[in-house]
């Protein structure tokens, strides 16, 4: 059974728990090299730990190249819009299979998301696809109107998609202290 959650809040809680246990996070930096228990960042900063987890989403393959390992992934772009205090707020999640749209209540907000566009690592917004998501949501939930979506921030993100649809989870061969966690696509 699917159940709603706020991904931002979930990840914040997960991060806080990991930091309490000694994990370190680095954002908006370029990984030059991943070694067995070490990471070299652009600019020379080096990090070391008991283990390194390579979880770079659609960019995991480029991060793992210094390990002499190929992790074939392709970015699958999806879009979402979040309405605060919408005119209609369903109590349950809905997956609109034919339209490939998900409707998710999150407290007093409603997240409307969908599509899968194989696009490399292009995060640009295709407004035609966004309008398709809005149209499907308004068709299935007549209380919603296209006007409610005017001025609402359009968001795009990349799902890391593996060729067979299965995630990469586990240790890198020959590297005792390096794990990969990526390729989860729509799981």
Place the predicted regions along the sequence by residue.
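A structural signal for short hydrophobic beta-strand segments in well-ordered beta-sheet cores
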Residues: 31-34, 101-104, 169
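Helical element adjacent to the flavin cofactor pocket in flavoenzyme catalytic cores
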Residues: 1-43, 47-50
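Central helical "cap/lid" subdomain
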Residues: 42-90, 126
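Flavin-binding catalytic cores
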Residues: 66, 86-89, 107-111, 117-158, ...
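Mid-domain beta-loop-alpha active-site segment that forms a flexible
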Residues: 1-15, 58-59, 129-136, 183
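A conserved FAD-binding loop/helix module that cradles the flavin
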Residues: 72, 121-128, 177-187
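Short, surface-exposed charged micro-motifs
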Residues: 48, 93, 100-102, 168
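C-terminal catalytic lobe of FAD-dependent flavoproteins
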Residues: 1, 7, 97-98, 138-187
């Amino acid at each position: 059974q699917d159940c709603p959650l706020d991904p931002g809040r979930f990840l914040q809680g997960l991060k806080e728990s990991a930091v309490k246990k000694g994990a370190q996070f680095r954002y908006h930096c370029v990984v030059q090299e991943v070694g067995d228990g070490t990471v070299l960042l652009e600019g020379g900063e080096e990090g070391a730990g008991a283990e390194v987890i390579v979880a770079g989403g659609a960019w995991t393959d480029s991060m793992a190249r210094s390990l002499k390992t190929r992790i074939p992934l392709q970015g699958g772009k999806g879009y979402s819009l979040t309405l605060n205090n919408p005119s209609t707020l369903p109590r349950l999640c809905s997956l609109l299979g034919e339209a490939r749209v998900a409707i998710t209540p999150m407290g007093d907000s409603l997240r409307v998301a969908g599509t899968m566009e194989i696009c490399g690592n292009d995060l640009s917004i295709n407004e035609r696809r966004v309008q398709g998501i809005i149209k499907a949501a308004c068709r299935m939930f007549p209380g919603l109107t296209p006007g409610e979506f005017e001025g609402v921030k359009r968001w795009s993100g990349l799902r890391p998609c593996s060729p067979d649809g299965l995630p990469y989870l586990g240790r890198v061969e020959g590297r005792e202290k390096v794990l990969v966690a990526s390729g989860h696509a729509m799981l």
